[in-house]
Amino acid sequence: MNQGANKTVLDRYLRLDIPDQKCQAMYIWVDGTGENLRSKTRTLNFTPKSPSELPIWNFDGSSTGQAERSNSDVYLYPVAVYRDPFRLGNNKLVLCETYKYNKKPADTNQRWKCMEVMTRAADQHPWFGMEQEYTLLDIDKHPLGWPKNGYPGPQGPYYCGVGANRVYGRDVVEAHYRACLCAGINISGENAKVMPAQWEFQVGPCEGITMGDDLWMARYLLHRVAEDFDVVVTLDPKPIPGDWNGAGMHTNFSTEAMRGPNGILEIESAIDKLSKVHEKHIKAYDPHAGKDNERRLTGHYETSSIHDFSAGVANRGASIRIPRGVAEEKTGYLEDRRPSSNADPYVVSERLVRTICLNEQ
């Protein structure tokens, strides 16, 4: 239990009435790691209905790896507003972009570039669906439910499993699912993964920039929910070395043409384009230019090799998978299985649109 935490006592205060015109707005942003999130709250005298109504704020960037101490203020520009599933009422979660003292995007602000690309490709209506895999850990960073001095049984019974000896952490998963729905995130499902204590949730279909916004906010909610259960979430793509599956962020992608009659031809064309820029995508698909994915994309445990591009129907060992139903109906989408679990969804979606929609190499 976190020191000083008492959820029963906290609930007493969360049920207190606050004036109708007051709103607690929690500003949320990606920090200097490009992976972790930070947040802080301010009181408003109105209930915002859109990001444009919210004031620009700032924070100490020297404490988040985003500025020098001698010039530490970094600006927060609100870009998306969600209902707050923790405080409820009129209270809001506010996703923000970060800008430096000179009003230029911070180094880890990947959203502005993604927004430019999505605007240019808007007439093609790019849709995304991202499958966020993650692993639950005890507070001591040991996989949740695993024996302290050993390992669970081999992989096999855990995927979509049922039972206390097969799944660990379902309370966190269910609470997160409901929190996302309450917040207004387009979450579409969840399931237990092949490795015990590993789970996945899916967000989408989302069009354009909404994909990155919803996924980052869903990640924030996951960490906050896990905090309430004294559980740690890791997005490490290979948290446990050895004969255990890694974690990815498989990304489903389509354009209006792919979803139309005989869209399989557009899908095949997209795969051909992707095959020519494999290395560029690998560098974009984790925060460390491919170093994280080197541990995961080995050609084993339902992954492709990081060094080779491949594609196939219903092939979970390929870089790009065409679902069986898509191949049969000749319309639909493709699945890019290369992105790492800790990849930035703005970077992944931007890279796909640049390659497939804008023909940039």
Swiss-Prot record:
<dbReference type="GO" id="GO:0005739">
    <property type="term" value="C:mitochondrion"/>
</dbReference>
<keyword id="KW-0479">Metal-binding</keyword>
<keyword id="KW-0496">Mitochondrion</keyword>
<dbReference type="Pfam" id="PF03951">
    <property type="entry name" value="Gln-synt_N"/>
</dbReference>
<keyword id="KW-0492">Microsome</keyword>
<dbReference type="InterPro" id="IPR008146">
    <property type="entry name" value="Gln_synth_cat_dom"/>
</dbReference>
<dbReference type="InterPro" id="IPR014746">
    <property type="entry name" value="Gln_synth/guanido_kin_cat_dom"/>
</dbReference>
<dbReference type="Pfam" id="PF00120">
    <property type="entry name" value="Gln-synt_C"/>
</dbReference>
<feature type="binding site">
    <location>
        <position position="316"/>
    </location>
    <ligand>
        <name>L-glutamate</name>
    </ligand>
</feature>
<dbReference type="GO" id="GO:0005783">
    <property type="term" value="C:endoplasmic reticulum"/>
</dbReference>
<feature type="domain" description="GS catalytic">
    <location>
        <begin position="110"/>
        <end position="361"/>
    </location>
</feature>
<protein>
    <recommendedName>
        <fullName>Glutamine synthetase</fullName>
        <ecNumber>6.3.1.2</ecNumber>
    </recommendedName>
</protein>
<feature type="binding site">
    <location>
        <position position="316"/>
    </location>
    <ligand>
        <name>ATP</name>
    </ligand>
</feature>
<dbReference type="GO" id="GO:0004356">
    <property type="term" value="F:glutamine synthetase activity"/>
</dbReference>
<dbReference type="GO" id="GO:0005524">
    <property type="term" value="F:ATP binding"/>
</dbReference>
<keyword id="KW-0547">Nucleotide-binding</keyword>
<feature type="binding site">
    <location>
        <position position="133"/>
    </location>
    <ligand>
        <name>Mn(2+) 2</name>
    </ligand>
</feature>
<keyword id="KW-0460">Magnesium</keyword>
<dbReference type="GO" id="GO:0006542">
    <property type="term" value="P:glutamine biosynthetic process"/>
</dbReference>
<feature type="binding site">
    <location>
        <position position="335"/>
    </location>
    <ligand>
        <name>Mn(2+) 1</name>
    </ligand>
</feature>
<feature type="binding site">
    <location>
        <begin position="243"/>
        <end position="244"/>
    </location>
    <ligand>
        <name>L-glutamate</name>
    </ligand>
</feature>
<feature type="binding site">
    <location>
        <position position="250"/>
    </location>
    <ligand>
        <name>Mn(2+) 1</name>
    </ligand>
</feature>
<keyword id="KW-0067">ATP-binding</keyword>
<dbReference type="GO" id="GO:0005829">
    <property type="term" value="C:cytosol"/>
</dbReference>
<feature type="binding site">
    <location>
        <begin position="200"/>
        <end position="205"/>
    </location>
    <ligand>
        <name>ATP</name>
    </ligand>
</feature>
<dbReference type="GO" id="GO:0046872">
    <property type="term" value="F:metal ion binding"/>
</dbReference>
<comment type="similarity">
    <text>Belongs to the glutamine synthetase family.</text>
</comment>
<feature type="binding site">
    <location>
        <position position="337"/>
    </location>
    <ligand>
        <name>L-glutamate</name>
    </ligand>
</feature>
<feature type="binding site">
    <location>
        <begin position="252"/>
        <end position="254"/>
    </location>
    <ligand>
        <name>ATP</name>
    </ligand>
</feature>
<dbReference type="InterPro" id="IPR036651">
    <property type="entry name" value="Gln_synt_N_sf"/>
</dbReference>
<keyword id="KW-0256">Endoplasmic reticulum</keyword>
<feature type="binding site">
    <location>
        <position position="131"/>
    </location>
    <ligand>
        <name>Mn(2+) 1</name>
    </ligand>
</feature>
<dbReference type="InterPro" id="IPR027303">
    <property type="entry name" value="Gln_synth_gly_rich_site"/>
</dbReference>
<dbReference type="InterPro" id="IPR050292">
    <property type="entry name" value="Glutamine_Synthetase"/>
</dbReference>
<feature type="binding site">
    <location>
        <position position="321"/>
    </location>
    <ligand>
        <name>ATP</name>
    </ligand>
</feature>
<keyword id="KW-0436">Ligase</keyword>
<feature type="binding site">
    <location>
        <position position="131"/>
    </location>
    <ligand>
        <name>ATP</name>
    </ligand>
</feature>
<feature type="binding site">
    <location>
        <position position="200"/>
    </location>
    <ligand>
        <name>Mn(2+) 2</name>
    </ligand>
</feature>
<comment type="function">
    <text>Glutamine synthetase that catalyzes the ATP-dependent conversion of glutamate and ammonia to glutamine.</text>
</comment>
<feature type="binding site">
    <location>
        <begin position="333"/>
        <end position="335"/>
    </location>
    <ligand>
        <name>ADP</name>
    </ligand>
</feature>
<keyword id="KW-0963">Cytoplasm</keyword>
<feature type="domain" description="GS beta-grasp">
    <location>
        <begin position="23"/>
        <end position="103"/>
    </location>
</feature>
